[in-house]
Amino acid sequence: MKKLLLTLSCLAFVQLVLAQKLDKMHWFNEPEKWDIKNNALSMFVTPQTDYWRISHYGFTVDDAPFYYGTYGGEFEVKVKITGNYKARFDQMGLMLRIDQQNYIKAGIEFVDGKYNLSTVVTHKTSDWSVIKLEKPAPFVWIKAVRRLDAVEVFYSFDDKEYTMMRNAYLQDNTPVMVGMMAASPDGKGFDAQFEHFSVKHLPDARRLKWLEDNADQ
């Protein structure tokens, strides 16, 4: 019984630490309705908001909800996303952001009644790539790995087998705002939930190489 109580206490402590970590993050464009419960972020996405710069459409917008922490160096970030998508371009997922002109957002985007794995990469101007899903997915895991000057973006339906959806440039040796974003450019908003958000530090590959090369000095 004591072991069981100790195990439960440890689990409760871990959940508390994770919840506190989520609570300590920051809003950029805070939505009117949001909540954190059981280490999950829920929000009603602000209507007619988005992140996009110039290309194809000729406008720049930077006004969608984004809940983030700031990280330097190399890392892996992932999250489980579930959305009640309703209107064209309703979207949610991860965002890695240096500033208004340099960011990557990746997740699910609802277009013409279809669910798409979507990535937007912005360096002064935005580009957009999609992978259409054959059928709606109740949830998707999105993962991004930042190594040196590149970010690899992956998706998964079970948090076990991941498939790459994009490899994109992101400036090296620069702090990055990392977190969860959602937007409803053409709609009236929707309910979005983010679960199991985590960021794992990855040792700097160049430092490890230097240490290996200079081990005997």
Residue ranges of each PLM-predicted region?
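Bacterial Sec-dependent N-terminal signal peptides
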Residues: M1-K21
